[in-house]
Amino acid sequence: MTTTKRAFVRDAWSIARTYWTSEEKWSAWGLLLAVVATNLGTVCTSVGINAWNRSFYNALQAFDTEQIFRQLAIFFVLGSLGITLSVFAVYLQQSLQLRWRRWLTQRYIKAWLSNRAYYQLQLTNGVDNPDQRIAEDINQFTNYVLTLSLGLLISLVTLGSFLFILWGLSGPADIPLGQLGLVHIPGYLVWVALIYAGAGTWFTVKIGRPLVQLSLAGQRLEGDFRFSLARFRENAESVASYGGEPVEVGIFQERLQNICQNFRMIMGRQMRLNWLTQGYAQVAVVFPLLVILPRYFSKQIGWGGLMQVASAFSYVYNSLSFVIARYPDIAAWEAATDRLTRFEEQLFELQAPVSAPRQIVIRRRGPAVGINSLDLDLPDGTPLLRGIRFAPLRGEAVLVTGPSGTGKSTLLRAMAGVWPFGRGEISVGEQNSLFVPQRPYLPLGTLTNTLLYPHLDRNGVPAERLKSVLTEVGLDGLVEELDVVENWSQRLSLGEQQRLGFARVLLASPALLFLDEVTSGLDEPWEARLYSLLRSRSWRPTVISVGHRSTLLRLHDQVFDLTRFIPLRDQVVTPLPSPLSTPIALAGSF
């Protein structure tokens, strides 16, 4: 076995064993035993039908009417049993696959969402289309593991059963080799079947091997194409306002062309493989008859024996030709395994304890909020900000300023615990906090769930309270739609979405609030009104904001300018306008 094959088997087992050793292992193994038992039952009925062939065709040759009808009755019993076992085998296998897929999908989703791994994967471009890997690759993996492994098992059992039958039926062959005389070969049909299937398997693997990489590329390209379509749909209004349809068409056509080009390569390789497999299958129809005819013409076997040998030979070569018949599926399974393995490796790296010397430590003890000697980097390690230190007072509103691209939003993300690239300590205290981006995330569902997100356990909030908050933020037109299920991110404008974000803040009552350009879609009067709503609440949160409007200066107590923390080689020489309030004092510790 080559290194690549060993790695594939190891990776496949690494993914599969998690389920078979999980809390569902007993039900899984029980279902698997039931599937194996029903499939073995179908093999037994096949052996019975093979023996029936001899009796039935001998009766036909002898014009034995009574025996013919007796054999037809036997066939009805064997056929009914075989059909029943086959139906239950498929049903039980699908049930097992469904259970396995559900469990494995939940496992990957938990790992993907744990510790914000999904966000870090997006920042680092670690793997492409993780949603496709979860939705499609897991389905393919579980399906192919069960289908191919059970198919291989049944092929081996069938091979063992019919090799014994074929050995007894084929008899010896005496092959003249000139001066060497006759070579006596017992069970010669068995050796013919082995050679025939072995040659076909070798050529199949040789021709079909490139299908693995082509399948990998195809899955990636299909995922990219679907993502571009979904992204267009989500941003339909922006595209329409720009008149960007020709550009989008060009993007779609380019990605579709890549899919078509890859698929043409698959077609070419599959065509070569089909020439082999189809020719192999057609020759196999008459091949066993040709090799057994000498015994039939010498009257060593009758018509029934001839048909039984042909049937046994077909079972043997079909079992030996498992790789030939299922190679495209094997290639697709290998591709799905590779994609899941790469995905799992990335998730494992993100979940593992950080051993690198550069890391951001979030401390959640004590009442104070502050930063101590924080360095921030870009994902590629490029320095962004150096030596940040500050400690806002409790209940204070701080506006973070600096030139565009300084890292203002990055600082907020680091304080919210979602930006991992850098080194230093951030204290956010024991109080609850909330990060509000420029465009709030509005999940699919009712307006009530959208308002309470992510604290859906607070569904006990009275409807009157929800309506009151909606009215406060200027969304009184939605007060009668609390139970309406809608795609709110498409229905509401940016300004309305930002108002809804403020409503969510008022309901959550966080003690520490991070606001990132949250009023960019609002006019100045509403901007002032919403900030006043926050500052007038009895729980008076500590607010750390990022924004570019000069009107924000009068809505905050302090201004924290990041210019002084830009690495020297990146500092901007042009002075900033003087703030309207006193810069926040640096804190030596917190």
Where are these regions (language model features)?
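Membrane-integrated ABC transporters
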Residues: M1-S46, S55-F75, A89-Q93, Y118-L156, ...
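A hydrophobic transmembrane-helix motif
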Residues: A37, G41, T45, N50, ...
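Primarily ABC-family ATPase nucleotide-binding module
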Residues: G126-V127, E344-L399, G422-G429, S468, ...
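An intracellular "coupling" helix at the cytosolic face of ABC transporter transmembrane type-1 domains
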Residues: I138-T142, L214-E234, A240-F287, D329-A332, ...
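Cytosolic ends of transmembrane helices, especially the final helix of ABC transmembrane type-1 domains
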Residues: G208, V212, G223, A240-G244, ...
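Helix-to-loop junction immediately C-terminal to a conserved catalytic motif
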Residues: A416
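Conserved "ABC signature" C-loop
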Residues: P440-N487
